[in-house]
């Protein structure tokens, strides 16, 4: 199942790229993610709780950042196992950042494979859930940048001008 889309973020590309690399910030934008643990600079574990149709699922999730091309692209591999039912999901995520004036277009594509009880629900149900999660993610990342709560990009301070 492939899910793709585009989100407009009200910030410059470097700032968005920096924020997306900040695992706690990224996790705070994904509804239902908690207990984030950094294994090393490119590996993370977390718990994801979500409801699909009438069923609630809790997943143990592992993320591996497989490629970073600053400030344009981030690729990751995601694997998850539901804690209460038999199944598994794997996904490869590709994210491209395109500068659009003072905003950034975040273009993403996720190729996911889902097995077990969750996989039996069918693509229309799962795509609907993915769109719902995308909407929440977009709301949260936009709100973080609009309220100045996103991680600040590392910049060199400007040299102060001498007073006249």
Enumerate the language-model features and the residues they cover:
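Glycine-rich portal/gate segments that line the openings of hydrophobic small-molecule binding cavities
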Residues: 38-81
